[in-house]
Amino acid sequence: MKNIKANELQTDLDVYGNSPHIYYTPNVQHHFTVAFTRDIEQPEFYDSVIHLLLTAEEGTTIDFLISSYGGHLDSLLSLRGALQATRADVTGYLMSQAASAAGMLLLCCHNFVINEFATFHAHTVSYGSYGKGDDVKQQVDYITKQTERIVRSIYDKILSEDEQNLLIAGKEFYFEDHEIRERL
């Protein structure tokens, strides 16, 4: 196996200069750690992470360190697609807070590790709309329909069907570490 200095690998994996840091741990099998420790940014911010997931070989392990208040849904959905397609085994480590899109990212992982005092916050989408009246109504109807599909597809790991209905109706859910573990 080729020895790669950490800063050389970081240069290779961080082509945009400000993407999430990806750390490679040389071992018999490939092991990577990706930190999600700020707001979930625009989709292009995660190009290197998505590339890592889509090109990972079987036997590769990837750890997502999650401590974030959430962010862009389109980025979460891009990461989710790559998580569904990857051959790697991905573990989500809830380090402290997983809110909104960050909580959904945790639920998209294959395995979970929940730190003591970690918290989880679930809610539906936040957005704004503008334009002509009929256009705004069509957009709101579309986003409402899409949001329901996303909620039912992702939150089913932690919320019952009745709780999913309440979430869609506007209720927010907050869970502490012991509650998260019980539900997962």
Indicate where each model-derived feature is located:
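N-terminal organellar transit peptides
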Residues: M1-M104, C108-L184
